[in-house]
C-alpha cells in the first residue's frame, strides 16, 4: 500500500538482493502522522533493516553471546530521510561451528540439557549471524547431526532466513553422524564398494533439502574425515592412490549432479 501510494520508492528495492530501506514516511496509515518504515527487497533484507535499527539504538549484535550491555535510553530520534546499506558484496556470509567439543558441546549440555544442538541453541546462533548481516552456516558435526537430532533445526533456519550448508565431509545435505549411527545397516563408507547404498543416502538428503535454500556440498571424503580409502585413526597406514581416487571422485561428482537434477528438476549449478 505504501508503494502504491508512492510513499516508498519501490525502484530502490526491486530486483535487489538482501537490501533494506529505512525511511520516515508521512501519514502512512489513517491516524498516524509520521512513522519510521523498514522495507526489504526480500525476507533477509527486511531482517537486516530491523537489526540495523536495533544496532543504531545501542543493541550490540553480541548482546547475548558476549554479554555486551544494552544501555537504556530515555529518548530516540532519527533524521527525516531514507537510509540503506545497499546490497551485500558477498553472496554467502556465515560461520562454521568447527571443533565444537568439549567447550561448545559442554555449554549446550549445561544450558539446554541435550547432548546435541537443538533449535533453541541454533536460533541464538542464527540471530547472531543475522545481526552481523550474515546469512549462512555450516553446523557442528563431530557428534551432532543438525538434520536428524531435532526436526525443528532445519525449520528454524528456514523461518529465520538462514541458508544452511554442510562441511567438506558432509555431502548432499547429509550429516556424517546419520551414517555413523546406522553403520551396521549401511555398511562401509566406500563409494567404490558400496555405491548403491551411498547413492540412496545422498538421494534422501536431497529429497529432504529440496524445498529449502540449503547450499549443497558435493564430493566425498573417507570415513571419519580421512583421505579416500583411508581409515580414521590410521593415517600412518594410508597408502596414497591419487589416480584411482581422482577417477572415483569424478564419478561421484557426476552421480551427485545427476541426483540433484533428478530430485529438484533444476540444473545442479542453479540449485
Functional labels for PLM-detected ranges:
Residues 69-79, 142, 148-159, 183-271:
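Gly/Pro-rich turn-and-neighbor structural signature
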Amino acid at each position: 500500500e505504501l508503494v502504491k501510494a508512492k510513499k516508498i520508492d519501490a525502484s530502490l528495492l526491486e530486483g535487489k538482493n538482501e537490501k533494506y530501506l529505512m525511511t520516515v514516511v508521512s501519514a502512512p496509515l489513517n491516524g498516524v502522522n509520521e512513522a519510521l518504515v523498514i522495507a526489504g527487497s526480500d525476507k533477509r533484507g527486511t531482517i537486516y533493516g530491523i537489526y540495523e535499527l536495533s544496532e543504531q539504538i545501542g543493541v550490540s549484535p553480541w548482546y547475548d553471546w558476549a554479554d555486551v550491555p544494552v544501555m537504556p535510553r530515555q529518548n530516540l530520534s532519527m533524521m527525516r530521510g531514507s537510509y540503506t546499506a545497499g546490497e551485500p558484496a558477498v553472496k554467502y556470509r556465515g560461520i562454521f561451528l568447527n571443533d565444537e567439543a568439549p567447550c561448545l558441546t559442554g555449554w549446550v549440555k549445561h544450558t539446554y540439557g541435550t547432548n546435541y544442538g537443538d533449535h533453541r541453541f541454533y536460533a541464538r546462533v542464527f540471530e547472531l549471524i543475522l545481526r552481523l548481516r550474515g546469512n549462512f552456516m555450516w553446523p557442528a558435526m563431530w557428534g551432532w547431526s543438525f538434520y536428524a537430532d531435532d526436526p525443528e533445526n532445519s525449520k528454524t533456519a528456514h523461518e529465520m532466513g538462514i541458508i544452511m550448508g554442510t562441511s567438506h565431509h558432509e555431502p548432499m545435505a547429509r550429516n556424517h553422524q546419520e551414517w555413523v549411527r546406522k553403520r551396521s545397516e549401511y555398511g562401509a563408507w566406500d563409494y567404490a564398494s558400496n555405491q548403491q547404498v551411498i547413492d540412496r543416502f545422498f538421494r534422501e538428503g536431497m529429497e529432504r533439502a529440496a524445498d529449502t535454500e540449503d547450499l549443497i556440498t558435493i564430493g566425498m571424503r573417507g570415513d571419519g574425515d580421512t583421505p579416500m580409502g583411508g581409515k580414521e585413526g590410521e593415517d600412518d597406514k594410508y597408502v596414497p592412490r591419487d589416480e584411482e581416487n581422482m577417477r572415483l571422485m569424478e564419478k561421484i561428482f557426476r552421480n551427485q549432479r545427476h541426483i540433484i537434477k533428478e530430485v529438484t528438476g533444476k540444473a545442479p549449478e542453479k540449485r
